[in-house]
Swiss-Prot record:
UniProt source species: Geobacillus kaustophilus (strain HTA426)
Name of the protein in its database record: GTPase Obg
Binding sites annotated in the UniProt record for Mg(2+): S172, T192
Record domain Obg: where: 1-158
NCBIfam families: Obg_CgtA (TIGR02729), Obg_CgtA_exten (TIGR03595), PRK12296.1 (NF008954), PRK12297.1 (NF008955), PRK12299.1 (NF008956), small_GTP (TIGR00231)
Domain called OBG-type G: residue spans: 159-329
This protein's GO CC annotations: cytoplasm
């Protein structure tokens, strides 16, 4: 089974904690602070592996967490930085932020890397906090939390040739006879629920990847049936092979089928109609096929090359494959969005609205709730087991304006303040 979209959770490693330590060596008077910094947490990195074709592996593992950095040590020894967590993805993977729907990366080339979640920096040891007024601080930071986010991975096939057509016109049968692919084949609609890939090699040694795509029905560009899933997979094919049931086994007119499918491609994305197209007039071994082919050619004219074939008996298949291989040699890729000239070096500045450092809301029990990325990060990096660290955290909140904001909201001595899963008591006349 082919999986073309999957949601996963990624988290960069937390930074290692800084250490509070002092030199205690003999004959070293006033040794001073000697606590080292923590190591950096590992990043979660996507790397394109051209040997992968599907997102199947992500069905079984959906959580990816990079290792945390090593804690700082005494004698000013820094903790070791954690190794990055490498996650391999197939070429053609689009990385989307599940919360904002923003496309973060489009990974197409072998070896291409993308850091999807950065590891946190290591916390500073007490050596970093030494000043003239406080030469022996008992302050150290906890490591910075690593980035965490929910990600949607979407895979678009990087096939050279896409087979399109109504359900049950013979696309799966054609793919099975020209490659080693073994798609499920039956005479009913929507047999091919997922794309099948096959590597095709012609007699003269040329090869290409062919995709038998899910059956298309009228209204696909609006999401009817399997339409959207089908159309996502065809976006990156360079040549379209339109398979038509020339025997009209299901009673439809072959020429009308041709018009309907092309209208769907046109409605979904204008660039799809720019791709060269070949018509594979299938089921020529069946009654009425010859007469239907004659009428079809009269209506189509020279607009598109038509190759009469029978996938079941392999009649005409060899000539079709040679024509496809010839066309691929002269057909460039068709990007859906205009690409900029790579010679033009351009820096893009993206405006992102600055979020407030904190927000204050009121709980039903009267407690004040503090929230915000900046204030939560400060909280997580504070070592509350040490009095000096607690005082430093209180000073940081005061400098951010938290105290004044709480007073404006009506906070009084003894009121409960919540931050994450912790509760504090508001002291209006706190003395540094």
């Amino acid at each position: 089974m082919f999986v073309d979209q999957v949601k996963i959770y990624v988290k960069g490693g937390d930074g290692g904690n800084g250490m509070v330590a002092f030199r205690r060596e003999k004959y070293v008077p006033k040794g001073g602070p000697a606590g080292g910094d923590g190591g950096k947490g590992g990043d979660v990195v996507f790397v394109v592996d051209e040997g992968l074709r599907t997102l199947m592996d992500f069905r079984y593992q959906r959580h990816f967490k990079a290792p945390r950095g090593e804690n700082g040590m005494s004698k000013n020894q820094h903790g070791k930085n954690a190794e990055d967590l490498i996650v391999k993805v197939p070429p053609g993977t689009v990385v989307i932020d599940a919360d904002t729907n923003e496309v973060l990366a489009d990974l197409t080339e072998a070896g291409q890397r993308f850091v999807v979640a950065k590891g946190g920096r290591g916390g500073r040891g007490n050596t970093r906090f030494a000043t003239a007024s406080n030469p022996a601080p008992e302050i150290a930071e906890n490591g910075e939390p690593g980035e965490e986010r929910n990600i949607i991975l979407e895979l678009k096939l990087l096939a050279d040739v896409g087979l399109v057509g109504f359900p049950s016109v013979g696309k799966s049968t054609l793919l099975s006879v020209v490659s080693a692919a073994r798609p499920k084949i039956a005479e009913y609609h929507f047999t091919t629920l997922v794309p099948n890939l096959g590597v095709v090699e012609t007699e003269d040694g040329r090869s290409f990847v062919m995709a038998d795509l899910p059956g298309l029905i009228e209204g696909a560009h609006q999401g009817v049936g399997l339409g959207h899933q089908f159309l996502r997979h065809i976006e990156r094919t360079r040549v379209i092979v339109h398979v038509i049931d020339m025997a009209a086994v299901e009673g439809r007119d072959p020429y009308n089928d041709y018009l309907v499918i092309n209208e769907e491609l046109k409605q979904y994305n204008l660039r799809l109609t720019e791709r060269p197209q070949i018509v594979a007039a299938n089921k020529m071994d069946m009654p009425n096929a010859e007469e239907n082919l004659r009428r079809f050619k009269e209506k189509v004219g020279d607009a598109v090359p038509v190759f009469p074939i029978s996938a079941a008996t392999r009649q005409g298949v060899r000539e079709l494959l040679f024509a496809i291989a010839d066309l691929l040699e002269t057909t460039p890729e068709f990007p859906l969005h205009e690409r900029e000239d790579p010679a033009v070096q351009r820096v893009v500045y993206k405006y992102e609205k600055e979020e407030p450092p904190f927000t204050i809301t009121r709980a039903s029990d009267g407690a004040f709730i503090l929230a915000g990325d900046k204030i939560e990060k400060l909280f997580k990096m504070t070592d509350f087991s040490r009095e000096e660290s607690v005082r430093r955290f209180a000073r940081q909140l005061k400098a951010m304006g938290v105290d004044d904001a709480l007073r404006e909201r009506g906070a009084k001595d003894g009121d409960t303040i919540r931050l994450l899963d912790y509760e504090f008591e508001f002291v209006d006349d706190w003395d540094e």
